[in-house]
């Protein structure tokens, strides 16, 4: 398994927090200045049930265990303001359909950006070439269905203009500059999307979802005494412009300013193996990357994950519980349904130290026999866009509260560090070996926090780190920022969180003393 670069959070990583390439505009006859209709695929492109049935028949003409058509239409708007000047303002559209058919262990997949009958039928025939059997029975009728309403908005972002967005961005810049005279440069970027999805399944369901999202990134540069320091913050949700209340904006600015200014007094810690307290919130990036991916079912189905034969076995202390939950209202990782049309929900991966389950798509759920006798798996099949196949993916992944307090954990550290904010790293998904870069943290000596630290490398192994968690606090926090996870060449938004937790030992890359 190749090592891969983790896509970090915040404005400095906004090039990594990019949306898919928008390769196709809507037809000239469509007035995209108007609000999107309830079903744009029908109203804009004439994709009705009869056409869906025709394409599905072609897709499954040589056999199918299951199949789906995944239609997507997505608008994205980006505004970037640097030191009071709008340096970027763009609006893009992507649209298309992905077609998949599964026969046994074989998957046929094709996509087209052209939502006309000829292009879709041609793509269906391409995907169907994997099979050579008798055609599947296509339902005579597709039943409309919705799986939830976890991120309803008063107004979609496609109806919010620059006259409302620019004052919001200018307010954030003014708040940052007023926070401290050392703040020298301020960059604010607002990215919003209005996405429509329509999924037609061989099982006869026709599912729709409207997925809003917004992410504000803030990057600050401060100057003091001949030194220059930079840091960042971000705040995102599946919500509308009303999400950015004065209280939330103040919290975003205060956090970013604090993270930046503390770097003037920070130093690198001593290098070596020592206890590491993972701070509540963003430290869950380590949990997500170094541990969570190993619990995705595709890696376990093919035996490349260290957890492949560990179901029912202890992987952590009894006070450690790890959950992936895709139905937390308005979180960026939340989905009403996954990209196969299955309902999302709460999947307990580690329950009181015991590995209980993996994250599944339809293919792995069938392999593990989960969807039998009326049972259904928690939907975790995701894709970056219609151009990509389905993979089991995390949504909102977190560790639950434990029996300790943060103060008790700090007091238990004789010589170690607190890792507070992360800006990137690498991980080998199967084995879980990792290197993470800590931007902000604290030195702990004799059970007391003694100094801020910066620019720290954490080196270790995810499954081993999970086993070495000896204390978990009761200060759980979901990180409010925007995170994008990369896997198999696909990037999807996720949410992360955890309480403070103590890893008894980890290799810290600092200064040799």
Predicted region positions:
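N-terminal small-residue-enriched
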Residues: 2-513
């Amino acid at each position: 398994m190749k090592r891969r670069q983790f896509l970090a959070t915040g404005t400095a990583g906004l090039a990594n927090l990019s949306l898919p390439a928008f390769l196709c505009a809507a037809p000239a006859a469509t007035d995209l200045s108007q609000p999107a209709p309830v079903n744009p695929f029908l109203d804009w492109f004439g994709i009705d049930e009869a056409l869906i049935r025709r394409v599905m028949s072609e897709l499954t003409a040589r056999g199918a265990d299951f199949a789906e058509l995944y239609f997507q239409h997505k608008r994205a708007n980006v505004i970037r303001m640097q030191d009071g000047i709008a340096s970027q303002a763009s609006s893009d559209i992507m649209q298309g359909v992905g077609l998949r058919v599964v026969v046994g262990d074989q998957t046929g997949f094709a996509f087209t950006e052209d939502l006309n009958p000829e292009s879709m039928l041609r793509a269906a025939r391409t995907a169907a070439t994997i099979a050579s059997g008798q055609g599947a029975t296509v339902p005579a009728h597709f039943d409309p269905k919705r799986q939830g309403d976890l991120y309803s908005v008063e107004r979609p972002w496609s109806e919010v203009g620059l006259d409302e967005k620019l004052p919001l961005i200018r307010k954030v810049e003014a708040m940052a500059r007023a926070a401290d005279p050392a703040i020298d440069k301020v960059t604010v970027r607002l990215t919003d999307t209005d996405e429509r999805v329509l999924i037609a399944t061989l099982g006869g369901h026709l599912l729709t979802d409207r997925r809003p999202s917004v992410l504000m990134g803030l990057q600050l540069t401060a100057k003091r005494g001949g030194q220059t320091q930079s840091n960042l913050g971000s705040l995102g949700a599946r919500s509308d412009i009303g999400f950015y209340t004065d209280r939330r904006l103040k919290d975003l600015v205060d956090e970013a300013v604090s993270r930046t200014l503390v770097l003037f007094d920070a130093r690198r810690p001593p290098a070596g193996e020592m206890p590491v307290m993972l701070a509540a919130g963003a430290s869950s990036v380590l949990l997500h990357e170094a541990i969570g991916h190993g619990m995705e079912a595709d890696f376990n189905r093919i035996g490349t994950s260290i957890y492949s034969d560990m179901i029912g076995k202890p992987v952590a202390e009894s006070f450690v519980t790890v959950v992936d939950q895709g139905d937390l209202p308005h979180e960026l990782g939340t989905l009403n349904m996954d990209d196969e049309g299955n309902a999302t929900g709460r999947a307990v991966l580690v329950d009181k130290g015991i590995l209980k389950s993996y994250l599944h798509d339809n293919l792995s759920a069938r392999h593990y026999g989960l969807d039998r006798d009326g049972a259904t798996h928690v939907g975790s099949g995701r894709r970056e866009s219609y151009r990509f196949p389905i993979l089991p993916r995390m949504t909102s992944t977190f560790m639950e509260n434990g029996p300790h307090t943060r103060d008790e954990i700090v007091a238990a550290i004789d010589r170690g560090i607190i890792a507070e904010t992360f800006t990137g790293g690498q991980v080998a998904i199967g084995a879980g070996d990792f290197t993470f870069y800590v931007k902000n943290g604290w030195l702990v000596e004799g059970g007391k926090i003694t100094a801020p630290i910066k620019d720290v490398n954490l080196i270790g192994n995810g499954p081993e780190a999970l086993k070495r968690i000896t204390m978990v606090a009761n200060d759980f926090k979901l990180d409010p920022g925007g995170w994008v996870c990369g896997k198999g060449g696909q990037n999807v938004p996720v949410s992360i969180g955890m309480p403070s937790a103590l890893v008894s030992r980890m290799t810290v890359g600092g200064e040799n003393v």
